[in-house]
Amino acid sequence: IEAVRATGGNNAKRILIVQGPNTNIDLFVANNYMAKIKDSAADRLMVEVHFYDPYQFTDMSEDQSWGKYWLYWGKNNTNGAEAGRTADAKYNEDYVEAQMAKMKTNFFDKGYPVLIGEFGANQRLAIGKDAVHDASVKDYYKAVVTSAINNGCVPMAWDTNGNFPSMTIFNRASASVSNANMLEGIQEAVKSAKWPAK
């Protein structure tokens, strides 16, 4: 930080983003990272983490010796057609809320703006093939955005602009919506969130 400040000009007071270790919420909080940082500019730091929990639902591409990838996530999506593909209940909406609350307590409430610089979950099955998977993807996006906003965090969906399966919300080439599940989850969250966070 001081190396940037020392270059002068606008860098002396530029807002700098500090990423947590591995952009991980628990590592950021556990290490009390911001207490170790010194900045000559007052109130010119913000923090960033990414959120892809639980990995088995959001981004795991194939089964591993230690576990299977999950197709279904959330309190309302436990009755999927494929056995053994439902996320562990400990990672449902309550977990998302608890993680975002950690960012509020440890950073937002202490005056640091908070970015959830990336989040997302892969749509694994073709839209319309499995209604419970579709609902899981939508509910995940809604839960992350709702909890982030309500806890003072600015969430940014990671849009890969890729081929299925992916985290693609928009097709940039055709300027069209690729995944209504994701977009509608975000839109519903923005409407229901408590603005501004307190």
Regions found by a protein language model. Give the residues of each.
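Active-site region of glycoside hydrolase catalytic domains
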Residues: I1-K90, A101-A121, N150-N151
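Alpha-helix initiation/capping motif
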Residues: N24-I25, N92-E93, N122, F164, ...
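A general structural detector for well-ordered alpha-helical segments in enzyme core domains, enriched
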Residues: Q99-N106, Y140-V144
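The substrate-binding groove and active-site-proximal loops of carbohydrate-active enzymes
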Residues: A83-E93, G128-D134
